[in-house]
Regions:
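Extended redox/cofactor-interaction regions of prokaryotic respiratory oxidoreductases
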Residues: 1-55, 59-60, 85, 148, ...
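Generic structural "secondary-structure junction" signal
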Residues: 6, 10, 21, 78-80, ...
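Hydrophobic alpha-helical scaffolding
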Residues: 9-15, 32, 36, 76-81, ...
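A short hydrophobic/aromatic micro-motif that marks alpha-helical segments and, especially, helix-coil
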Residues: 12, 94-95, 168, 214
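Active-site-proximal structural scaffolding
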Residues: 18-19, 39, 50, 68, ...
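Long, well-ordered, tryptophan-enriched scaffold segments
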Residues: 56-58, 63-167
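Short helix-capping/linker segments at secondary-structure and domain boundaries
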Residues: 94-102, 182, 198-205, 279
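Active-site phosphate/pyrophosphate-binding segments
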Residues: 115-116, 121-247
């Protein structure tokens, strides 16, 4: 969720009910039937919308989930933490088979190719060069390359890319599982590149690649008081703050409000969150 504003400026995406206008639904690590209060009504809206559109649904997730549960047209199991590599392999096919929405990329996007590369950016520092192996790492992100990382057969990656490139509107979304790892925010942003490449952003039946939007109920909350302590760290680094707090700095560890921590964490008050255990990117460490 925190990665989307760095791509779009907000977390917004199309609602589940808009799938009634879609031809294809692709879910990356998304399991609303189990993670949103046992579905929270989303599963019902999903089924109703698909019944109206007859959209094909592909679920990409390591284990078979309740969201799939016979509703999916295809389940593609993937090695955990490798969604970004899959996206790169798909992007390679989209680019090489001319399945990208070039007018959309030229008009609305920055940094896809040399035409929209910002002034001062390094040569071949654009997304297209990265995918084709013309960037700094020199590695072409071919389906064969992606297959070795993800465990998904090469021909299935190619087929998936063509399905995404040829089915418009396509509703591409993700859950929060893919980014529950080190540098996971980049995985979330990678998934968002698929609707960008294919011009499925901002249209009926499309999506931004974010988690599906749904109906909300306004609830009363306690007022938020001003915190006199201005120093803060990422919630994922609480383990480091216990083990080596005084060594953590702003430049290396993302400490905010101070150049470095003065003391390690000695007490944790955890409320309405589970970053202490199973929502952390390194549960072996927690």
């Amino acid at each position: 969720a925190c990665a989307m504003p760095y791509t779009y400026g907000s977390n917004d995406g199309n609602s589940t009910s808009d799938i009634e206008n879609s031809k294809l639904v692709v879910m990356f690590g998304n399991n609303p039937a189990e993670t949103r209060m046992s579905g929270g009504g989303i599963t019902w809206y999903l089924e109703q919308a698909r019944e109206r559109s007859n959209a094909r649904m592909i679920v990409i997730v390591p284990r078979y989930t309740d969201t799939a549960a016979g509703r999916e047209d295809e389940w593609i199991p993937i090695r955990p933490g490798t969604d970004a590599a899959l996206v790169a392999g798909i992007a390679w096919v989209l680019i090489n088979e001319d399945l990208v929405d070039q007018p959309f990329l030229d008009k609305y996007c920055v940094g896809y190719d040399e035409k929209t590369l910002p002034a001062g950016a390094p040569a071949n520092g654009h997304y297209k060069a990265y995918i084709l192996g013309e960037g700094d790492d020199g590695i072409a992100k071919t389906p064969q390359w992606a297959s070795r990382i993800t465990g998904i057969p090469t021909d299935r990656i190619i087929k998936l890319a063509r399905e995404i490139g040829m089915s418009k509107p396509a509703y591409i979304c993700q859950g929060w599982g893919p980014q529950r790892q080190a540098n996971g925010e980049l995985t979330a942003r990678a998934i968002a590149m698929l609707p960008i490449l294919t011009g499925n952003v901002g249209i009926n039946g499309g999506n931004s690649g974010a988690r599906e939007s749904t109906y909300t109920i306004t609830i009363e909350r306690l007022p938020v008081l001003e915190n006199p302590v201005k120093t803060a760290i990422s919630c994922f680094t609480w383990t480091d703050a216990i083990a080596r707090g005084p060594e953590m700095t702003a430049s290396r560890d993302g400490v905010r409000g101070k150049e470095k921590l003065d003391v390690p964490i000695k007490f944790i008050w955890n409320y309405a969150g589970n970053t202490i255990t199973n929502q952390h990117s390194d549960i072996n460490k927690t």
